[in-house]
């Protein structure tokens, strides 16, 4: 039985709304995948070790840290910028502090600017690879080990890059189960004492 008149219009409208909702839901993971594959949008590479080829040419790396509106931590780079030789591994630290009276879990997203440098900036180790949990009042320094691929000097756009900015944004996430269970036990014991 074919739909006619207003029923057909309603069915088409509902179909369009469902399709647009599915497209919106899928856009974030699809864009993330696209950026990781192409290096578009300042997404960095990941490597196990720095290359053996270290150039005499240096490049300035700037560090930036920010928080999502709902993240209660304080978060900043320990050093705002450093010069590294291209191909040499660098080590920088970011400091995070949880001023609240509860454990808070966070996950960091990152990007590199200018965007054409993203494909040449490689992380060896990074706090952003894992979720971070800070206890109440805890302050930590979190490392990131990186290098700039020597191929940047041969790239049509990359060879003009003299400064790269590595930016992180921390977002609050749900506590992992082991922390959430421990907090529930602590809260229950506190209420039973009152």
Swiss-Prot record:
Residues 1-12 are cytoplasmic. One of its GO terms (biological process) is respiratory chain complex IV assembly. It is a single-pass type II membrane protein. The chain crosses the membrane at residues 13-35. GO terms for molecular function: copper ion binding. The keyword Cell inner membrane applies. Keywords: Cell inner membrane, Cell membrane, Copper, Membrane, Signal-anchor, Transmembrane, Transmembrane helix. It comes from the Bacteria. One of its GO terms (cellular component) is plasma membrane. The keyword Iron does not apply. SUPFAM superfamilies: Ctag/Cox11 (SSF110111). InterPro entries: CtaG/Cox11_dom_sf, Cyt_c_oxidase_assmbl_CtaG. Its main location: membrane. Coiled coil: none annotated. It is found in: Cell inner membrane. Residues 36-194 are periplasmic. Belongs to the COX11/CtaG family. Exerts its effect at some terminal stage of cytochrome c oxidase synthesis, probably by being involved in the insertion of the copper B into subunit I. This is Cytochrome c oxidase assembly protein CtaG. It comes from Roseobacter denitrificans (strain ATCC 33942 / OCh 114). The gene is ctaG.
């Amino acid at each position: 039985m074919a739909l006619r008149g207003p029923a057909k219009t309603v069915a088409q409208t509902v179909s369009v709304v469902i399709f647009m909702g599915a497209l919106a839901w899928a856009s974030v993971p699809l864009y993330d995948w696209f950026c990781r594959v192409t290096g578009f949008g300042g997404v960095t590479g990941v490597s196990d070790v720095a290359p053996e080829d270290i150039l005499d040419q240096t490049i300035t790396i700037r560090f930036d840290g920010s928080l999502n509106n709902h993240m209660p931590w304080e978060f900043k780079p320990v050093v705002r910028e450093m010069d590294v030789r291209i191909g040499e591994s660098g080590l920088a630290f970011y400091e995070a502090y949880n001023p609240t009276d509860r454990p808070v879990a966070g996950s960091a997203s990152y990007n590199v600017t200018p965007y054409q440098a993203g494909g040449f900036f490689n992380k060896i180790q990074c706090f952003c690879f894992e979720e971070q949990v800070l206890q109440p009042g805890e302050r930590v320094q979190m490392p990131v080990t990186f290098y700039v691929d020597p191929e940047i000097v041969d790239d049509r756009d990359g060879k003009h890059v003299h400064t790269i900015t590595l930016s992180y944004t921390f977002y609050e996430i749900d506590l992992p189960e082991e922390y959430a269970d421990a907090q529930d036990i602590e809260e229950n014991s506190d209420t039973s004492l009152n």
